[in-house]
Regions:
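Bacterial Sec-dependent N-terminal signal peptides
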Residues: 1-8, 14-58
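Beta-propeller fold detector
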Residues: 108-111, 150-154, 197-200, 239-245, ...
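Beta-propeller domains
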Residues: 88-106
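Beta-rich, blade/repeat-based domains predominating
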Residues: 69-86, 113-133, 138, 155-183, ...
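Short loop/turn segments that connect beta-strands within beta-propeller blades
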Residues: 100-105, 143-147, 189-193, 232-235, ...
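A short helix->beta-strand "capping" segment at the edge of beta-propeller domains
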Residues: 57-71, 241
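A short loop-to-beta-strand structural motif that recurs across blades of beta-propeller domains
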Residues: 96-98, 138-140, 185-187, 226-228, ...
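Glycine/small-residue-rich hydrophobic helix-like segments
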Residues: 232-295
Length: 328
């Protein structure tokens, strides 16, 4: 509710707002009909209310952005480079990476080596692209100038990997689900490509994100509908695991943080993006047109444009987030 009080300049007849009721206000009431003031106040309040409502709808309403089935149903792992280009895996066929330029044009950026299929893309501080290759059990590195692809890290004991995220110091964390058995693992890959198993016997680890300050790691378990949070130690190991949020119904997939510490989570088959605040409370569910969001990323000039990959539509949807995204 918005409360508005008014006063009148006797010389000019102009009406202006005041913060509290004063004797002058009572005198003013004698000069003007209260009905006129109520009409003006109602109009101003209505304009203010509509402005707030329209702004909220613009922030939290997703829209289509490109033709359906531009990518395959395996579209995943979106990421934006320093020039504003948007990337995702499986452009028109499996084993590729597609590029969507700021002007909306799109095409195949590169084809991965035979036997490799990407599932997640991130950009390192070196400007190069890193790809979770779930069929090859690799983290691939792509030189963005030459498009040369190399194996940055390989671990045959990985089930996949599925999703990856950078910490501020260059460490990579990887989720590693075992879908048939509904189990999962967490891995750490250091800047010198050393691979370490952090935790096993988890649920189906899927989406993974680092907090805005780089001090916490979030991991969700799709089948178990749980989101966990860890404290990140200086050496990259994890401690103080605790339950952050539990959902009811529908699965989860990729997720990202914004600069205020809010967490955006893809609700697979529900067709929404769940927005959790830093305390783990569900603040909003952003409705999408498609039903199978697989991941999301932030981009645009102000880093508030959120791009969501939709597997049932084979394309992106987009919405304006309240705050800029945080990427490492």
């Amino acid at each position: 509710m918005v409360s508005v009080f008014f006063d009148v300049n006797r010389a000019s007849g102009d009406i202006y707002g005041i913060n509290d009721i004063s004797p002058r206000f009572l005198e003013t009431v004698k000069l003007l009909k209260m009905k006129s003031i109520q009409v003006i106040a109602s109009l101003l309040c209505g304009i203010l209310y509509c402005g707030i409502s329209l702004n909220a709808q613009n922030v939290l309403k997703a829209t289509g952005w490109m033709p359906e089935h531009t990518f395959t149903s395996g579209i995943e792992g979106p990421a934006v480079d320093s020039e504003g280009n948007l990337y995702a895996v499986n452009y028109k066929k499996e084993g590729t990476i597609g590029i969507v330029r700021p002007d909306g044009s799109h095409g195949c950026f590169l084809t991965l080596p035979e036997g490799s299929t990407g599932n997640s893309i991130r950009f390192g501080k070196d400007g190069n692209m890193y790809v979770a290759d779930y069929t090859g059990h690799n983290i691939l590195k792509v030189d963005m100038r030459s498009k040369k692809i190399s194996v940055f890290a390989h671990e045959p004991k990985m089930n996949q990997p599925n999703d990856i995220v950078f910490a501020p110091n260059g460490n990579i964390y990887a989720s590693d689900p075992d879908w048939p058995n509904q189990k999962g693992q967490l891995w750490l890959i250091t800047p010198d490509a050393k691979v370490s198993l952090l935790e096993t016997n988890m649920g189906t680890t899927n989406g993974i994100a680092v907090s805005e300050d780089g001090k916490r790691l979030y991991v969700n378990e799709s089948a178990q509908l749980k989101v966990w949070v860890y404290d990140i130690c200086p050496d990259g190991t994890l401690r103080n695991k605790r339950l952050f949020h539990t959902f009811e119904g529908y699965g989860m997939d990729g997720m990202k943080c914004d600069e205020k510490g809010n967490l955006y989570i893809c609700r697979y088959d529900k067709g929404t993006i769940a927005l959790l605040n830093p305390q783990g409370d569900l603040v909003e569910e952003i409705q999408l047109t498609g039903k199978q969001p697989s991941n999301l990323t932030f981009g645009g000039p102000d880093h508030r444009q959120c791009y969501v990959t939709l597997q049932d539509r084979g394309c992106f949807e987009t919405f304006k987030a309240p705050y800029p995204g945080k990427e490492w």
